[in-house]
């Protein structure tokens, strides 16, 4: 075990504070509509330009181990805010820096760090309660567009795309962001359920121009196993022929004589049929087939349930108003499933999303949820250069998460004003002793930091702006740094999602309180000389050889 270096008290906190400042100062220049860009060097390819706080924070790694510990803890604030609300990362970083700075001074003046922490916790509770009380529900598309515009650093086009996407796929629908190959940004909406499997054979195609299978009012057979034996399929095929309706078979695979017979019947026109491989693998495939069954009002045929293929009846099949299958995707529109069944399945998937610890599983569950709940919207972000597209995509991602958060918990006035107003409530908090009172005061001072920083980034005097805003007693009154005017921020469309502001202050205070209560730090000693160990002096040639 290598030797360690240990720092105590003021020395430890000073080194840590230096790291916090380096990271926070790099991140906070991006805050607000007039925030600046940060250029990130990449080991390969062109540098990356971004205005996204968490992207900047993730790139920062400091040489000094003690400074780096401070920086990494504040980086955690940005990451946690991004995970919980998808935005507010810069605000959270600015708040954490302000609380740590004021808290550090209080500890250096001889106050009890644990009482300071209790005071900070009391203050945060009061701030959250005030935010929730003054939160306003988002109802119109205009408000959704405004939230998107603010979060995308004032880009009106992005706000409009997001509100259109949410209008089309609903609040539960999935919105994915991709890089476009063109200059224009565009929105593409897939209604109904789509999965990434196409037809097994091109002979099933009904629309030769588009190379697509298009069926109206179709039956859907959902089978977990391979189908190769014709005899087990025959009873069902005969029953479907009698109805005159088309049949879509979703199975692990269709091969051999079963596939040959389906193709021949399709070509002769005796049976409108198409076969598709089941999506996913393993347990996920089972779950997705069950989703399709619930959406279409059918039953997933599985040997686990003791149902044999030859015993399948028309009542076990799903139904859909329209099914489209191309080479790569299958889309089922207007399935005949019962609304109550679909809602129960949606609730079940939501519960799984809450429980899972894996990001990959969460992403896949959210995709399944969207397919059941409404559809998928894809925003393809365009731009003149790859660097511009990447920078814009970062902003669209932020804006998408912010609009989701706004729909979930409502909105408050933006520009750091909601936190400024909450700071006025902290004067009334009762504490047990003076140190706790100082803890509350630390948070009260820190709450003006985001509004101050937005003004500074716009070239204004932060203290003057904060003073003028607090003079007026209207909750929504604030400073619009884009135009340099004061007024009702909600009417001007300058709004923040309550969830974003709430998670920013909670995460910032949580990590900052830990930094304030730190008394010792332990890190490995830097290696002396920097040479790798291993070879003895003198080259270490083979014994007995004289070169």
From Swiss-Prot:
GO terms for biological process: protein refolding. It catalyses: ATP + H2O + a folded polypeptide = ADP + phosphate + an unfolded polypeptide. Its main location: cytoplasm. Its EC number is 5.6.1.7. GO terms for cellular component: cytoplasm. GO terms for molecular function: ATP binding; ATP-dependent protein folding chaperone; isomerase activity; unfolded protein binding. Keywords: ATP-binding, Chaperone, Cytoplasm, Isomerase, Nucleotide-binding. ATP binds at residues 30-33, 51, 87-91, 415, 496. Pfam families: Cpn60_TCP1. The keyword Plastid does not apply. It comes from the Bacteria. InterPro entries: Chaperonin_Cpn60_CS (IPR018370), Cpn60/GroEL (IPR001844), Cpn60/GroEL/TCP-1 (IPR002423), GroEL-like_apical_dom_sf (IPR027409), GROEL-like_equatorial_sf (IPR027413), TCP-1-like_intermed_sf (IPR027410). It is found in: Cytoplasm. HAMAP family: CH60 (MF_00600). NCBIfam families: GroEL (TIGR02348), PRK00013.1 (NF000592), PRK12849.1 (NF009487), PRK12850.1 (NF009488), PRK12851.1 (NF009489), PRK14104.1 (NF010704). Together with its co-chaperonin GroES, plays an essential role in assisting protein folding. The GroEL-GroES system forms a nano-cage that allows encapsulation of the non-native substrate proteins and provides a physical environment optimized to promote and accelerate protein folding. PANTHER family: 60 KDA HEAT SHOCK PROTEIN, MITOCHONDRIAL (PTHR45633). Forms a cylinder of 14 subunits composed of two heptameric rings stacked back-to-back. Interacts with the co-chaperonin GroES. Belongs to the chaperonin (HSP60) family. This is Chaperonin GroEL 1. It comes from Rhodopseudomonas palustris (strain BisB5). The gene is groEL1.
């Amino acid at each position: 075990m290598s030797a360690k270096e240990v720092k105590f008290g003021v020395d430890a906190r000073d080194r840590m504070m230096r790291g916090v400042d380096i990271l926070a100062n790099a991140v906070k220049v991006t805050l607000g509509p007039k925030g600046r860009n940060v250029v990130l060097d990449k080991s390969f390819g062109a540098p990356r330009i971004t205005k996204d706080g968490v992207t900047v924070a993730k790139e920062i790694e400091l040489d000094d181990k003690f400074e780096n510990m401070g920086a990494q803890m504040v980086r955690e604030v940005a990451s946690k805010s991004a995970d919980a609300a998808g935005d507010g990362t810069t605000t959270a970083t600015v708040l954490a820096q302000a609380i740590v700075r004021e808290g550090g001074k209080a500890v250096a003046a001889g106050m009890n760090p644990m009482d300071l922490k209790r005071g900070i916790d009391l203050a945060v509770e009061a701030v959250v309660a005030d935010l929730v009380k003054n939160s306003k529900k988002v109802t119109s598309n205009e408000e959704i567009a405004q939230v998107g515009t603010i979060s995308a650093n004032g880009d009106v086009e992005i706000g409009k795309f997001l509100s259109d996407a949410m209008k089309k796929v609903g609040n539960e629908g999935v919105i994915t962001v991709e890089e476009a190959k063109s200059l224009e940004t565009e929105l593409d909406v897939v209604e109904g359920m789509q999965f990434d499997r196409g037809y097994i054979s091109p002979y099933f195609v009904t629309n030769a121009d588009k190379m697509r299978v298009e069926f109206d009012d179709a039956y859907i057979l959902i089978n977990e196993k391979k189908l190769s034996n014709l005899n087990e399929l025959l009873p069902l095929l005969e029953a479907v022929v009698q109805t005159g309706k088309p049949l879509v078979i979703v199975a692990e695979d269709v091969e051999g004589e079963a596939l040959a017979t389906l193709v021949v019947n399709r070509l002769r026109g005796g049976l409108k049929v198409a076969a598709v491989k089941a999506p996913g693998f393993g347990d996920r495939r089972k779950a997705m087939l069950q989703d399709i069954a619930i959406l279409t009002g059918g039953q997933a045929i599985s040997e686990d349930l003791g149902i044999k293929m030859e015993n399948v009846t028309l009542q076990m099949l799903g139904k859909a108003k329209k099914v489209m299958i191309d080479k790569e995707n299958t889309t089922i529109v207007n399935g005949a499933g019962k609304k109550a069944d679909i809602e129960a399945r949606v609730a079940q998937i939501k519960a799984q999303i809450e429980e899972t610890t894996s990001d990959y599983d969460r992403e896949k569950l959210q995709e399944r949820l969207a397919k059941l709940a409404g559809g998928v919207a894809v925003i393809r972000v365009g731009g003149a250069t790859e660097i511009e597209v990447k920078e814009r995509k970062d902003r669209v991602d932020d804006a998408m998460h912010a609009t989701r958060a706004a729909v979930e918990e409502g909105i408050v006035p933006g520009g750091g004003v909601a936190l400024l107003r909450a700071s006025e409530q902290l004067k009334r908090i009762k504490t047990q002793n003076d140190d706790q009172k100082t803890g509350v005061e630390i948070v009260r001072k820190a709450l003006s930091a985001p509004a101050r920083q937005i003004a500074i980034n716009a070239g204004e005097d932060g203290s003057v702006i904060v003073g003028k805003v607090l003079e007026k007693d209207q909750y929504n009154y604030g400073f619009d740094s884009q135009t340099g005017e004061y007024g009702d921020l909600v009417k001007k469309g300058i709004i923040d999602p309550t969830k974003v502001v709430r998670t920013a202050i909670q995460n910032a205070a949580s990590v900052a309180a830990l930094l304030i209560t730190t008394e010792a730090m332990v890190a490995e000693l830097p290696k002396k000389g920097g040479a790798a160990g291993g070879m003895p002096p003198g080259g270490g040639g083979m014994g007995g050889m004289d070169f």
